[in-house]
Regions:
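Structural motif
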Residues: 43, 89-91, 128-132, 167-174, ...
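A short beta-strand motif characteristic of beta-propeller blades
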Residues: 53-68, 97-105, 136-143, 180-186, ...
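Repeated scaffold domains used in trafficking and secretory/extracellular systems
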Residues: 66-77, 107-118, 146-157, 189-199, ...
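Residue position within the beta-strands of beta-propeller blades
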Residues: 84, 122, 161-162, 205-207, ...
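Non-cytosolic head/periplasmic domains of membrane-anchored proteins
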Residues: 102-207, 214
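Solenoidal tandem-repeat scaffolds enriched in leucines and small polar residues
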Residues: 168-262
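Blade-level signature of beta-propeller repeat domains, shared across WD40, Kelch, NHL, RCC1
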Residues: 356-386
Length: 386
């Protein structure tokens, strides 16, 4: 009996010890969970976008909006909506309250998106799949066997895309929102790096990149959908082409060290190669290009200018500090620095709003009087007075 009593006592002691260990483990887990929550709240830092004189920082509706990841995030203006691309999904947000109007998982390895007023084209660059979405509905997803290079979408839902060619270098194709073929063209000169379609879907532009003696040789082509060959082509400066975009009948060409505007079959270089370094750019609601540039790389003094479709540089002004991003809306431009967001009047360069931020802010998107701030895995809304 004594032996049995001792065994029973040992079992009871072991049970109490195990219970104590489990209690300690749960306490530790609870503390860790609380610490994680606190760290996340500190990371979001809701109060760090406090405005300066005459400003108001208000978080409304579902803002701050939580993203499903922090890598590869881009925010686009899609008409009066916000299109948000992450490494896992494409989402359209109502900018007034942050509510999702559409979201879809894309499953692409290297997703890129382009937006018109109503349509979104999202594709897997270097991969095979491309999808077109409209007002919360997926119209189609196609598969290309040779590898997609770039794509754009018009206001009427036409999609132009370039892919690697089985016979030449690049294939350019235009399809409608119902997947009807409208144009096909194959190019031997080089791989297409940039592509654009006019708002009304009547013509396209694309840049093909070649090289000689270790020097880049980009060439711009213009082509009407009704034609079988480009109606114009231009040799561009030997630097990276950052973007091409139609605004009305005019085409902007933004290079790493130049800016040009094409009207008809004439190209005018507005900012000359070798004299500027492009830092950041955006397009205003009026159709003008707003660009920040400096005289050399990594400069802390930059010039911000509005360039009209006619190729005129309107009232450039100087800002101090390294620029991370900018976004234009109407007559104003928001500029992101390492520790601040400043909003300037394009007419005279005067500062109308200042908000503090941290270096964790990666991009900004301005719509009307609001600035949407992407910080890691959240999008915050900064409201300013008009």
């Amino acid at each position: 009996m004594e032996a049995e009593d001792r065994q029973a006592l040992r079992r009871e002691r072991k049970r109490l010890k195990d219970k104590k260990v489990r209690r300690i483990v749960w306490i530790v887990l609870a503390v860790l969970l609380a610490a994680i929550v606190i760290l996340k709240l500190c990371e979001v830092d809701f109060g760090s976008l406090s405005g300066g004189s005459g400003t108001s920082s208000v978080l409304t509706g579902n803002f701050p909006y939580a993203l499903d990841g922090s890598d590869g995030v881009t925010v686009h203006k899609q008409g009066a909506k916000l299109a948000v691309l992450t490494g896992g999904s494409i989402t359209v947000l109502n900018p007034s309250d942050g509510k999702e109007e559409f979201t879809a998982v894309h499953g692409y390895a290297n997703p890129i998106t382009a937006a018109s007023d109503s349509y979104l084209v999202t594709y897997d660059q270097g991969g095979s799949k491309l999808r077109l979405d409209y007002s919360g509905e997926n119209l189609y997803e196609i598969e290309n066997k040779t590898g997609l290079l770039c794509a754009d979408v018009a206001d009427d839902g036409k999609v132009v895309y370039a892919a690697q060619s089985a016979d030449k270098r690049s294939d350019i194709q235009v399809i409608t929102k119902t997947r009807a073929d409208k144009m096909k063209y194959s190019l031997s000169y080089g791989f297409v790096t940039n592509i654009a379609i006019r708002d009304n879907g009547s013509q396209v532009a694309f840049v093909a990149m070649n090289s000689k003696d270790a020097r880049l040789q980009p060439k711009l082509y213009l082509m009407r959908l009704k034609d079988t060959e480009p109606y114009a082509s231009f040799d561009l400066p030997g630097t990276q082409v950052l973007d091409i975009a139609y605004r009305g009948s005019s085409l902007y060409v933004v290079g790493g060290s130049f800016v040009s505007v094409v009207n008809g079959d004439k190209l005018e270089t507005v900012l000359k190669n070798g004299e500027v370094q492009t830092v950041a750019y955006d397009y205003s609601t009026s159709g003008d290009l707003v660009v920040a540039y400096s005289s050399y790389s990594n400069a802390t003094q930059n010039t911000v200018a509005r360039i009209t479709a006619g190729g005129k540089v309107q009232k450039p002004f100087t800002v101090q500090g390294a620029i991370k991003d900018l976004s234009a809306s109407g007559s104003r431009v928001a500029v992101l620095f390492a520790d601040k967001i400043k909003i300037y009047k394009l007419s005279d360069g005067s500062v109308v709003h200042t908000a503090d931020c941290t270096d964790a802010v990666r991009s900004i998107t301005m719509m009307s009087s609001n600035v949407f701030v992407q910080r890691q895995s959240v999008i915050e809304k900064e409201e300013t007075k008009s």
